[in-house]
């Protein structure tokens, strides 16, 4: 009693589950049938109740469900061309109807939305000047693809902004030196860590003084 949720809640939970579970999770949820507990005396053959694994190209999870109050429910995820979509249906009248409606929902997602890659993993986002006197720059990189999803019909204005930590020198290769914001139509929709691809030391007061004198004389 008094235990409620909605499709949006389940979609958020599914996205987080995929994020932390990764391929280990999807390797299990994508199995249509398999022996369970093979190393025990209680091993048995289990057939996945998510029939979309064989009905819809790209489906690799997640969970079916049923209660009298909620009806036939389904949280599904499918991936095509590096774009992953999560669909949630609740209170369907029968498993067949649930499957048909989910196929329609996934079709709508793939037909109307696309994933745009702004920067590929390990690509240089920009070069950042860290010491004007030495003209020292470092390559700024991301450790994952930086992407966003847009409606195919939308003409969105997209930009990125790197926010650097203050006084991050000295820095080693791989250290986080700031964040990159993905901004769509003036609104920040995602934030990623960015890293230095270079070792860089901090100039001492003495070295700066010597360089200044050399510059003057």
Describe the role of every protein-language-model region.
Residues 2-4, 8-217:
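Domain-terminus/edge residues, biased toward the C-terminal soluble/receptor-binding domains
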